[in-house]
Amino acid sequence: MKLCVALDMASKEANLALAHELSGLDVWLKVGLRAYLRDGAKFIEELKGVTDFRVFLDLKLYDIPNTMADAAEVIAKVGVDMINLHASSGTHAMRTVMSRLNALPSRPLVLAVSALTSFDESEFSAVYNENLAAAVRKFSVMSYEAGLDGMVCSVFESRLIKDTTSTDFLTLTPGVRPFGESADDQKRVADLSAAKEQGSDFIVVGRPIYESNEPREICERILGKI
């Protein structure tokens, strides 16, 4: 299991300072929509310049197939190591993206978002008119058959996805509160032991690290447990 640290702070300077503080640790860095819109591809270059960090660019692509493929190709050429898109964009869109990326000399890992961890069962049903677990199964099969590398899901769906597809199909799980911290705006959260039990390949941790006075120490504690 790998730790992915969310760089969700309010300024590029704060995010870069955290990256420098974590230099040398075996962690991934997650760059979200706000940071990328504000700081652009140059920010990715700066992160890569700190040390040999691998970067997950969390933009959750969702559009018509060719537009998604165009965007994915541009993102891949920025040099990130993982990207994501919405499974609900459909099988054709996901296959179009993978066909485009597989034609490149190298490509990032591509994960599909099943259901945002800010959704609970009732909110998900109101949007998709479907049971959460059933939808996750459907989305995981669609993504697996489209040739993606894995899924973004809650800890509680990780084992379900692997049982439905393959143990090699990656799961990245946001909403992890390693030591029982507040859930904030997440609904389906879990701790480290649950993430390990459910077979998560990547865990995303943000606030418990960057809101700490000792973020490197928190990362080291997490790494020691995974």
From Swiss-Prot:
Active-site residues from the entry: K60
Protein name: Orotidine 5'-phosphate decarboxylase
EC code(s) of this entry: 4.1.1.23
Catalytic activity: orotidine 5'-phosphate + H(+) = UMP + CO2
Binding site for substrate: 8, 30, 58-67, 117, 177, 186, 206-207
Gene that encodes the chain: pyrF
Cross-referenced PROSITE patterns: OMPDECASE (PS00156)
Domain of life: Bacteria
Native source species: Campylobacter curvus (strain 525.92)
One GO term describing the cellular component: cytosol
Classification via HAMAP family: OMPdecase_type1_B
Subunit text: Homodimer.
Chain's role: Catalyzes the decarboxylation of orotidine 5'-monophosphate (OMP) to uridine 5'-monophosphate (UMP).
Keywords, alphabetical: Decarboxylase, Lyase, Pyrimidine biosynthesis
Gene Ontology molecular function terms on file: orotidine-5'-phosphate decarboxylase activity
Biological process, per Gene Ontology: 'de novo' pyrimidine nucleobase biosynthetic process; 'de novo' UMP biosynthetic process
Record-stated family: Belongs to the OMP decarboxylase family. Type 1 subfamily.
InterPro entries per the UniProt record, alphabetical: Aldolase_TIM, OMPdecase, OMPdecase_AS, OMPdecase_bac, OMPdeCOase_dom, RibuloseP-bd_barrel
Pathway(s) this gene product operates in, as recorded in its UniProt entry: Pyrimidine metabolism; UMP biosynthesis via de novo pathway; UMP from orotate: step 2/2
